[in-house]
Amino acid sequence: MDISAQNEEAFHWACNLGHLEMAQWLFQISKERGHYINISAINDWVFRVVCGNGHLHVAQWLLQIKPDINISAQNEQAFRTACFYDYLAVAQWLFQVSKERGKTINISAEDEYAFRWSCINGHLAVAQWLQSLKPYLYVINYDENGEYQNCYIRCKKEANWEKRKYLLYIASDCKEDNLLYRLPCDVAKIMIGYV
């Protein structure tokens, strides 16, 4: 039986779906046959997908057997997707590992991708944790073209009051005379000063 058929597809899918025992068994067979599975193929793709799928136990095992995995590959993709899909434990673990390695993850990669998408997707615990790491995230702010990115405007469509209140609480420019602050408050019928 060729366990490496189709570029080690069996191993990759076992990892990606969180089947740790299956992945360990396949890896052991490859060792016994003298053909080690290439865990770092395609710029550590398996590790990145495992983290994005929330399989902390598999990610920890992969890092244990291959300590030089680039956990920051593809501009912090493992971290960003863990935040995107609400896998807080995975994101926190990756952040801790990066600190231990002396190269802390850039939590602001891809224009605050992890924070923006955790807010948009309603992952309040992830957003709060990210904000605690970098307390001066500007979530309501003009860009150089005079336009704005506003997680609040996006999340108001979901009718998630807790998330909206939190974003307004940490915003850098929540002043009563700020149109970006007043407009969403007016639309959502929130009284300014009572958020």
Predicted regions and their residues:
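Ankyrin repeat arrays, specifically the small/polar loop and inter-repeat linker segments at the C-terminal end
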Residues: 1-8, 30-44, 66-76, 98-112, ...
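Conserved ankyrin/ankyrin-like repeat signature
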Residues: 21-22, 57-58, 89-90, 125-126
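Ankyrin-repeat and related helical/solenoid repeat scaffolds used for protein-protein interactions
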Residues: 85, 111-130, 135, 142-143
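Cullin-RING E3 adaptor/co-adaptor recruitment helices
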Residues: 146-195
